[in-house]
Amino acid sequence: MVATNRCCVFALLFALLLVHSLTEAGKGKEILGKIKEKIIEAKDKMKAGWERLTSQSEYACPAIDKFCEDHCAAKKAVGKCDDFKCKCIKL
C-alpha cells in the first residue's frame, strides 16, 4: 500500500512538473516572438537608413567615393566627389 501511494505521489509530481514545463515553454515562445519582432523592426530601420544614405550620396561623399559612383551609375553617369559634393557627369 505504501508503494502504491508513493507511485501516485510521484505521478502527481511528474504531472505538475510537465504542466509547469509546458506553461513556461509557452511564455518562452512569447518572449522569443517579441525579440524576433524587435530584431526585424531594427533590421528594417537599418535597411531604410542605408537606402536613404545611398540615395543621397552627397552626405557620404567625403568618406566613401563608392556612394557617389553608385548614385551616379543609377543615373547612367560617372560620379566624382568634389569638395563634399557628388557630381554626376553624363556620358
UniProtKB/Swiss-Prot annotation:
Residues 1-25 form the signal peptide. Its main location: secreted. It is found in: Secreted. Residues 26-42 form a propeptide. Residues 58-91 form the BetaSPN-type CS-alpha/beta domain. Keywords: Antibiotic, Antimicrobial, Disulfide bond, Ion channel impairing toxin, Neurotoxin, Potassium channel impairing toxin, Secreted, Signal, Toxin, Voltage-gated potassium channel impairing toxin. The keyword Signal applies. Expressed by the venom gland. It holds the Pfam family Scorpion_toxin_alpha-beta. InterPro entries: Long_scorpion_toxin_alpha/beta. Disulfide bonds join C61-C81, C68-C86, C72-C88. One of its GO terms (cellular component) is extracellular region. One of its GO terms (molecular function) is toxin activity. It comes from the Eukaryota. One of its GO terms (biological process) is defense response to bacterium. Almeida et al., 2013 suggested naming this protein TstKMK, where KMK represents the first three N-terminal residues of the mature chain. However, Batista et al., 2007 identified a mature chain that begins two residues upstream of KMK. The full peptide presents antibacterial and cytotoxic activities. The synthetic C-terminus (AA 33-76) inhibits voltage-gated potassium channels Kv1.1/KCNA1, Kv1.2/KCNA2, and Kv1.3/KCNA3. Belongs to the long chain scorpion toxin family. Class 2 subfamily. This is Potassium channel toxin TstKMK.
